[in-house]
């Protein structure tokens, strides 16, 4: 009998169906197209509380230091609104469905996330991912250089963001 090996990832296959060249979302109307858009997701229980607050403060610091950067963060968590809501270059929006998320991810300069699914999908869009965790279940992405584990400590997150924003070779 012959052996058949099936490999792949249906989430990656879905990207081919959901990402659209003529995609529109109202948040994109509020973003200066000349700026680098960073998409952020952060939801894991391990990051709730102070780890999230550190990342949020770092996001503010980076946005304030870079005139050419805007952030899109689909969120309904109150700590994010408490720390980030009064900055015109940080767009807090309602959580996105998969079609919207894939298309906004495709338009992003890079992505910051603690989501395993995002770690799988973003590299297929050619987007680097700063992983807001100390570990990952996707070590192949780290080995390939498409994912960078940065955790939630302010200095590590800021240095990784600065590197992607300023080093054209990355």
What are these regions (language model features)?
Residues 1-170:
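Nucleotide-activated sugar donor-binding and catalytic core shared by glycosyltransferases
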């Amino acid at each position: 009998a012959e052996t058949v090996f099936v490999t792949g990832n249906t989430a990656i296959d879905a990207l081919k169906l959901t990402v659209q060249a003529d995609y529109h979302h109202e948040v994109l109307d509020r973003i200066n197209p000349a700026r680098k858009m960073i998409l952020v997701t952060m939801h894991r229980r391990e990051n709730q509380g102070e780890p999230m607050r550190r990342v949020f403060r770092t996001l503010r610091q980076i946005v304030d230091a870079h005139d050419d950067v805007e952030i899109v963060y689909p969120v309904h968590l109150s700590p994010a609104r408490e720390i980030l809501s009064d900055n015109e270059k940080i767009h807090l929006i309602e959580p996105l469905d998969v079609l919207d998320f894939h298309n906004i991810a495709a338009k992003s300069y890079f992505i910051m996330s603690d989501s395993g699914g995002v770690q799988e999908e973003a590299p297929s869009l050619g987007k680097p991912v700063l992983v807001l965790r100390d570990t990952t279940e996707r070590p192949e992405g780290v080995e390939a250089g498409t994912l960078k584990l940065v955790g939630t400590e302010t200095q590590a997150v800021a240095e990784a963001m600065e590197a992607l924003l300023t080093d054209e070779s990355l």
